[in-house]
C-alpha cells in the first residue's frame, strides 16, 4: 500500500521541477523572450496539464495503481517497451543533473577536488536515499522544499532596493519569442510526468498534481523575475548560473554579506532529493522489465552508470546548457505522445476485454 500523502506528492513534484529548472533553462528563455521570460512558464504549465489529466483519468478506475502498474497489467509487451523508454528518459535527466551538480560544486565551492570524487560522493548519498523508497523521498521533499521555497518567495523583498522595474518593460514584446521561451519552459515542466508514474490516483489526486506544477512554476518565475529585474535581460543571459548570481546580491547586514552560502545550504538537499528521485524511478521502472530483477541490488550499478553517462554525454558546461535546447523535443515524445499512446493501449485493451466477455 502506497503510504505517500497528497501533500508529500505535491512537494515532491514542485521540488522535482524546481531543483535544476532554476539554473540553465532560464538562460535560453531570456535569450528568446528577454524581459518577458519570467512569465512564459505559463505556457509550459498549459502544455503539460492535459497529459497529466489523461494519466489521472486512466488511474481513476484503478485508484490504487500507478501508470507503471496499469501498463504492466494491461499490455505486458507494449507496457515494458514504454516503461523502458521512460526509464531511459529519467536516466538521461539524472545524468544531466549529476553532471551539472558536479560542475557547480567544482566551480563555486571545491575547485581543487577531482570531479570523479565529487561524483562518487553525490551518487553515494543519492543511492542511500533512493534505497529507502518513495515514502522517504517524499518526506525529504516536504522537509527541504518548504524552507527553500520560502527563501525564494521572499527573494524580491530582500532585493527590493536593487530591483529596476524598467528592466521588465516592454511587456509582451513579440509573440514568436514568447512562444519560444514557453517551449524552453516546457523542457522543465514536462519532467512532472514522473508523478503519475510513481503515485496512484488515491495517494496523489489530479488536484494535487496540478498544484505541484503550479507551485514549481511560481517559484521558478519568482527566481527569474528577481534575476531579470536586478540585472536586466541582456546581462542575465550571459551568466552561467543566473539564480546564484542574483542570490549573491543579497546583503542583509555588514556581517552577513555571504547569504548565498546559507541559501546554497538549503538548495543542495533539494537537488540531492531530485537526483535520488530520478534514480528511484529508473530502478523502479527496471523492476517491471523482468520478474527476477531485484531493485535493491540495482541502485548501486544504476547510480554509478548515471555518473558515467553524465561525463560521457556532457563534456563541458556548454553541452549542459545546449541540452535544454533539445530537451523540449524529447519531452514532446515522453510527456505528450507517450501518455496519449498509453491511453490508447489501456482503453483498447479494456474495450476488447469487454467485448470478449459478451
Curated annotation (Swiss-Prot):
Highest taxon of source: Bacteria
Pfam families in alphabetical order: Spore_permease
Record's keyword annotation contains Ligase: no
Primary localization class, coarse: membrane
Spans through the membrane: 10-30, 36-56, 81-101, 107-127, 143-163, 179-199, 210-230, 262-282, 297-317, 326-346
Coiled-coil zones: none
Gene Ontology cellular component terms for the protein in this record: plasma membrane
InterPro entries: Spore_GerAB
Keyword Amino-acid biosynthesis: no
Keywords: Cell membrane, Germination, Membrane, Transmembrane, Transmembrane helix, Transport
Function: May be involved in spore germination.
Family: Belongs to the amino acid-polyamine-organocation (APC) superfamily. Spore germination protein (SGP) (TC 2.A.3.9) family.
Protein name: Putative spore germination protein YfkT
Organism: Bacillus subtilis (strain 168)
Gene expressing this chain: yfkT
Amino acid at each position: 500500500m502506497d503510504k505517500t500523502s497528497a501533500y508529500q506528492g505535491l512537494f515532491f513534484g514542485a521540488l522535482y521541477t524546481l531543483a535544476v529548472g532554476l539554473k540553465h533553462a532560464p538562460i535560453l528563455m531570456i535569450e528568446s523572450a528577454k524581459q518577458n521570460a519570467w512569465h512564459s512558464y505559463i505556457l509550459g504549465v498549459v502544455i503539460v496539464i492535459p497529459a497529466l489529466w489523461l494519466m489521472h483519468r486512466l488511474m481513476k478506475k484503478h485508484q490504487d495503481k500507478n501508470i507503471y502498474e496499469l501498463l504492466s497489467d494491461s499490455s505486458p509487451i507494449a507496457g515494458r517497451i514504454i516503461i523502458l523508454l521512460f526509464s531511459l528518459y529519467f536516466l538521461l535527466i539524472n545524468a544531466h543533473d549529476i553532471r551539472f551538480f558536479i560542475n557547480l560544486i567544482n566551480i563555486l565551492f571545491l575547485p581543487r577536488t577531482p570531479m570523479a570524487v565529487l561524483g562518487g560522493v553525490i551518487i553515494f548519498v543519492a543511492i542511500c536515499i533512493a534505497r529507502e523508497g518513495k515514502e522517504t523521498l517524499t518526506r525529504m521533499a516536504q522537509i527541504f522544499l518548504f524552507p527553500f521555497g520560502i527563501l525564494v518567495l521572499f527573494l524580491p523583498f530582500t532585493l527590493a532596493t536593487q530591483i529596476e522595474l524598467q528592466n521588465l518593460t516592454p511587456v509582451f514584446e513579440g509573440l514568436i519569442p514568447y512562444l519560444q521561451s514557453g517551449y524552453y519552459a516546457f523542457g522543465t515542466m514536462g519532467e512532472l510526468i514522473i508523478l503519475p508514474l510513481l503515485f496512484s490516483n488515491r495517494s496523489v489526486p489530479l488536484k494535487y498534481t496540478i498544484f505541484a506544477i503550479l507551485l514549481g512554476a511560481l517559484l521558478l518565475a519568482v527566481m527569474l523575475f528577481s534575476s531579470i529585474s536586478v540585472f536586466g535581460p541582456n546581462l542575465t543571459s550571459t551568466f552561467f548560473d543566473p539564480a546564484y548570481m542574483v542570490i549573491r546580491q543579497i546583503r542583509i547586514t555588514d556581517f552577513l554579506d555571504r547569504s548565498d552560502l546559507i541559501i546554497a545550504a538549503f538548495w543542495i538537499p533539494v537537488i540531492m532529493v531530485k537526483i535520488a528521485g530520478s534514480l528511484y524511478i529508473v530502478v523502479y521502472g527496471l523492476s517491471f522489465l523482468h520478474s527476477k530483477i531485484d531493485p535493491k541490488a540495482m541502485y548501486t550499478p544504476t547510480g554509478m552508470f548515471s555518473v558515467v553517462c553524465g561525463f560521457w554525454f556532457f563534456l563541458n558546461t556548454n553541452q549542459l546548457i545546449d541540452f535544454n535546447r533539445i530537451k523540449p523535443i524529447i519531452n514532446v515524445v515522453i510527456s505528450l505522445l507517450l501518455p496519449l499512446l498509453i491511453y490508447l493501449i489501456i482503453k483498447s485493451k479494456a474495450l476488447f476485454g469487454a467485448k470478449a466477455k459478451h
